[in-house]
Amino acid sequence: MENLTLVSCSASSPKLLIGCNFTSSLKNPTGFSRRTPNIVLRCSKISASAQSQSPSSRPENTGEIVVVKQRSKAFASIFSSSRDQQTTSVASPSVPVPPPSSSTIGSPLFWIGVGVGLSALFSYVTSNLKKYAMQTAMKTMMNQMNTQNSQFNNSGFPSGSPFPFPFPPQTSPASSPFQSQSQSSGATVDVTATKVETPPSTKPKPTPAKDIEVDKPSVVLEASKEKKEEKNYAFEDISPEETTKESPFSNYAEVSETNSPKETRLFEDVLQNGAGPANGATASEVFQSLGGGKGGPGLSVEALEKMMEDPTVQKMVYPYLPEEMRNPETFKWMLKNPQYRQQLQDMLNNMSGSGEWDKRMTDTLKNFDLNSPEVKQQFNQIGLTPEEVISKIMENPDVAMAFQNPRVQAALMECSENPMNIMKYQNDKEVMDVFNKISQLFPGMTG
């Protein structure tokens, strides 16, 4: 701001005048020359004093007042002079500096952190949606298989039999055709073996014929009985203990359950017990790694549900979901499950912590509206859109993983307040690698 400058001089010292021309007398200053305006001092406050010369060399006239006015709207000062000393003072009205508006949340680095938080949240929701859909599909398929298997379970065959059809009804044992042939052949042998002779007496001798008739059929009957017993043994080798009452697809279910990692069984345990398992990754660890604690209430499920209804958020998240899940009704269907809703609420509660970073992040996410003018203004200042920030971070998970480092979080917090604080981390390789990665992802970001 251009201020007023007062320049004073006496009649005996005309060289002190700046920008003045004298014609006949030193007492009458003429108009100022505007050709050299840069000579005039532009200071807010100037105080100058000069020792008076000897009374003999000074005329008895009073000091003159010279006011140099430069294009300013408002201020003038009064100049007084005496024989002993001269004083010139210039003052300018103090202009109050407006405080920074509360809507200015932070620098672009802070919005990068907001993008990391949103991407971590959406990634967790996406992974759980996939697991939940897979578990639901498996349960539906197994229920259909059990229903189909129950249709074959009738009284015609035992429930544990691996054969889908009952055995044919067993008839009463009948004589073998070989046995009848042998019997008939035995009778023929008996007849032909004996010679009919004229008996010398009235009583014939039936003893040899009776022995042949009794002995030979008994041998044939025993051989056929052994063959029959051997055939029966062939069907009785399978013990009933080896057959189980499970369905034919039970082995497949056991193999799939054995080979599945812990992460795939995480959500099934949540559905059954209503809480995450003690071992393995839980929902809260995602945001605890970002520095979150259990300081207070964080983002609510209702706010998340409202955020997922935003078309802009859907545009950012849906490309990373399977094709069958790119539907807003899917999220509503998921959130109807009380166990899944409670798990999400526990995870969101852990987002609020004791650090300043966590408080700012939580407060920002609570009232985060991509369509609000303040958010648009912030992203316009850094030359990026919310879609670009979040999509680039979700495409590069290394950046989100790097934000789990507490030193990176502290550096991001300090540099968001004052960009010159980055000089403190010039020798920290981890922090500088993260900043270099951010500068590569967002080349238009400054500050």
From Swiss-Prot:
TM region positions: 105-125
Outcome, altering residue 405 to A: Loss of stimulation of HSP93 ATP hydrolysis
Keywords: Chloroplast, Membrane, Plastid, Plastid inner membrane, Protein transport, Repeat, Transit peptide, Transmembrane, Transmembrane helix, Transport
Primary localization: plastid
Organelle targeting peptide span: 1-43, 44-76
Subcellular location: Plastid, Chloroplast inner membrane
Domain STI1 per the UniProt entry, residue ranges: 310-344, 386-425
Effect of residue 396 to A: Loss of stimulation of HSP93 ATP hydrolysis
Tissue-specific expression: Expressed in seedlings, flowers, leaves, stems and roots.
GO biological process, one term: protein import into chloroplast stroma
Known function: Involved in protein precursor import into chloroplasts. Part of the motor complex consisting of a co-chaperone (TIC40) and a chaperone (HSP93) associated with the import channel (TIC110). Causes the release of bound transit peptides from TIC110 and stimulates ATP hydrolysis by HSP93. Involved in reinsertion of proteins from the chloroplast stroma into the inner membrane.
Name this protein carries in UniProt: Protein TIC 40, chloroplastic
Native species: Arabidopsis thaliana
